[in-house]
Amino acid sequence: MQMQSRFSPQAAQTLRTAIKEAGGVEVFAIGSMKNDIVDRLEVHCRGNKGAVPALLSRSKPGQVVIHNHPSGVLVASEADMMLANIYGDDGIGVVIVNNDVSKSFWVVEPYKEHQKK
């Protein structure tokens, strides 16, 4: 279930820094894909140890929404699965990462037709 991270070094560092600056709590980011990896991302929300707001209107088909699980357990919660269904129907991927962004679990793959090559 856990796999190597599919993030560019810059995108991974941006997310690691945001998580660290938020005190290790959950953060929510939107990433743009290129060649099947997250090439760049923007952090939009910070939450607590167990939850973070997951904005529905800002991401576009072909992008991914990303949040971390501070516990390091990359298993989608019921809330994660509910949101994954909504995002997935819109062509948006859903990714859960650990705090150092070395592992990721891709709950939903993004719609590839909208990705940059």
Cite the ranges covered by each PLM segment.
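Glycine-rich short-loop/terminal segments
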Residues: 1-58
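Active-site-proximal loop/helix of nucleotide/amide-processing enzymes and allied scaffolds
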Residues: 1-6, 49-117
